[in-house]
Swiss-Prot record:
PROSITE patterns named among the record's database cross-references: HTH_ARAC_FAMILY_1, HTH_ARAC_FAMILY_2
Name of the gene this protein is made from: xylR
Gene Ontology molecular functions: DNA-binding transcription factor activity; transcription cis-regulatory region binding
Signal peptide span: none
Name under which the protein is recorded: Xylose operon regulatory protein
Length: 392
């Protein structure tokens, strides 16, 4: 006698990293539970959404951040688990079993990270209400609540929706806003994509990040880290855990378990700290300029003389001011920047160690191994094996 195999439909946009991670979480539950499910992922379900009731199978896990999906499933008579963002008002939740990413906790994690760095001015770059992204509205609400509770000054800019035809206009308006922010402001972007827009504008305007502005995103999207010169700090959502919990809950529903309407909040995984929030409370303009130059050119084999030329003051003057502000010599900071770049590439890429050594300006692989071992008490290979963030 064979157990009944359930046919389960997943309604997600597989082109989005967040959606893919939710689906991966569903897969992890199937592997762990050995459930007899046949998974159906409709690649272009929007083309047939008006007849959605004809092909749903025995149960559904769906993206309820998408209003169109929520409406299409309103009167469906199969077990449904919605996945989406949390709401600060209970009545905003859809009337289905629901697994939510905790929007308040996501923004709070970013906010606390910036506070720990010594930032005490805050800004939020969101999305316009016309975008229809309810999770963006909730994250903006969370930011306003947090700065009000802590009695900080916080400013919000929703910006424009970006498309190829208005891209430059949107970036120009973002540039106007960024130039109104006082130095040492920490900006929380509603997504990594919006954070990347900030980093691009800062580069065009020669605003040093993180010396003058700090930026943190939400999502920890793999793609974003490769598209910006300054590596982006980000809050990693528990998207896989959401998928796992959704599948686990659906399993209980398929087993006819009686339960009240479930609303499960999934907290963020952690803050992934990178260069964009590596903030030092610097006030001396010459030191800020020198630090920015070093960050951008350390791996090109620069010496102290090039830093002095870039800043335009004498060595004794800059060394004195540098020591007072940073607590290190200029030479030591160049060395530290090269090493940090190498460490970051080891854990965030699959580049060969020899290639990383060359990219970071070391004269030989042997010398790189020697310097790295002295700083971290382990070899570059051993460090990568333990700390790699790359999913192979």
């Amino acid at each position: 006698m064979f157990t009944k195999r359930h046919r389960i439909t997943l309604l997600f946009n597989a082109n989005k990293a967040y959606d893919r991670q939710v689906v991966e979480g569903v897969g992890e539950y199937l592997q762990a539970s050995q459930s007899e499910w046949d998974i159906f992922i409709e690649e272009d379900f929007r083309a047939r959404i008006d007849k959605i009731k004809d092909w749903l199978g025995d149960g559904v896990i769906a993206d309820f951040d998408d209003k169109q999906i929520e409406q299409a499933l309103a009167d469906v008579d199969v077990p449904i688990v919605g996945v989406g963002g949390s709401y600060h008002l209970a009545e905003s939740y859809p009337p289905v079993h629901y697994i939510a990413t905790d929007n308040y906790a996501l923004v709070e994690s970013a906010f606390l990270h910036l506070k720990e760095k010594g930032v005490n001015r805050f800004a939020f770059y969101g999305l316009p209400e016309s975008s229809g992204k309810r999770w963006a509205t909730e994250r903006e609400y969370a930011f306003r609540q947090l700065v009000a509770e802590e009695k900080y000054r916080g400013v919000v800019y929703q910006g424009l929706e970006t498309a190829p035809e208005n891209w430059q206009h949107a970036q120009n308006r973002l540039a106007d806003w960024l130039q109104t922010l006082p130095p040492q402001t920490g900006i929380i972007a509603v997504t990594d994509a919006r954070a990347r827009h900030i980093l691009q504008v800062c580069e065009h305007l020669h605003i040093p990040v993180p010396e003058k502005l700090c930026v943190i995103g939400i999502d920890n999207e793999e793609l974003t880290r490769y598209l910006s010169r300054v590596a982006l700090s980000s809050v990693a959502q528990g998207a896989r855990q959401m998928g796992y919990q959704a599948a686990k809950l659906l399993h209980r529903l398929l087993d006819k378990e009686e339960m009240p309407l479930q609303r499960i909040l999934v907290p963020p995984v952690r803050v992934i700290e990178r260069r964009s929030t590596d903030y030092r409370s610097l006030t001396d303009p010459a030191v800020i300029q020198a630090m920015h130059y070093i960050r951008n050119h350390a791996c090109k084999g620069i010496k102290v003389d090039q830093v002095l030329d870039a800043v335009g003051i004498s060595r004794s003057n800059l060394e004195k001011r540098f020591k007072e502000e940073v607590g290190e010599t200029i030479h030591a900071m160049i060395h530290a920047e090269k090493l940090e770049k190498a460490r970051s590439l080891l854990i965030s890429t699959t580049l060969s160690i020899n290639e990383i050594s060359q990219m970071c300006g070391y004269p030989s692989l042997q010398y790189f191994y020697s310097v790295f071992k002295k700083a971290y008490d382990t070899t570059p290979k051993e460090y990568r094996d333990v700390n790699s963030e790359v999913m192979l």
